[in-house]
Amino acid sequence: AAVKYSKKFFEDVEFYPEDAGRADQDFLCKMVEEVIKAGATVINIADTTGYNLPEMYGKKIKYLMNNVPNIDKAIISVHCHNDLGLATANSIAGLQNGARQFEATINGIGERAGNTSLEEVVMALKSHPDLNLDTNIDSKKIVPISKKVSRLMNMPIQRNKAIVGANAFAHSSGIHQDGFLKNRDNYEIINPEDVGLKASSIDLTARSGRAALKHRLELLGFSFSKVELETIYINFIEMADEKKLLHDEDLYELMKKYK
């Protein structure tokens, strides 16, 4: 009745079967069939408690696609929660099995542990073009929008948050830094410019190696021999042990004795 009533006012009527993630498959199919008959155009399959594993959720979507006679008259949408940290994986599993809409939020904001992270799904699909699930979203706006939402909602972004966290494109381990400087593809699958950043960053810490230090010093205009670099590196490590993260002003201070 609610769907029929809504249809009097709106062409697009979306129906949410609450806790569909744990619902009986056949009961869910009958319900979906009836609401489509009543005029629903989108069926949001809600994993309300974040209970499902990706394989379970994907099978649920596939079962609906194969067992609801009038499923072609509506769009199946996925709506996942992150209670087990699986909202992104579950959403992608749903899309792989026939869903053609996913509901998500910037930075994964949402009830309890949050909802599906928009930026994660967008970049996962972009990184796997073989899935043929292009969102047509301008990914270069991801980081600016993420920062704006964080500021307006007064909700800091976790530093190691995928895609938009401060550490997402930062390299601090010496081995990683050396490999990254030789070929970015060694340690990055996403170009930072694709999400609205100017570049990746090399964080200089006590874990950094000679390659990263040499790279940064040369960018600052310093020149030195290979032998001199060894002495500079020893002093750098001593400073890094004390200050944890070194900035350009620290490097200028470090290099005063080598002018």
Language model region names:
Residues F9-F10, F15, F27, Y63, ...:
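Phenylalanine-focused residue identity feature
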Residues A1-I76, I92-A99:
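Alpha/beta enzyme core
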Residues A2, Y16, D24-M31, L53-K60, ...:
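General structural feature for long, well-ordered alpha-helical segments within catalytic domains
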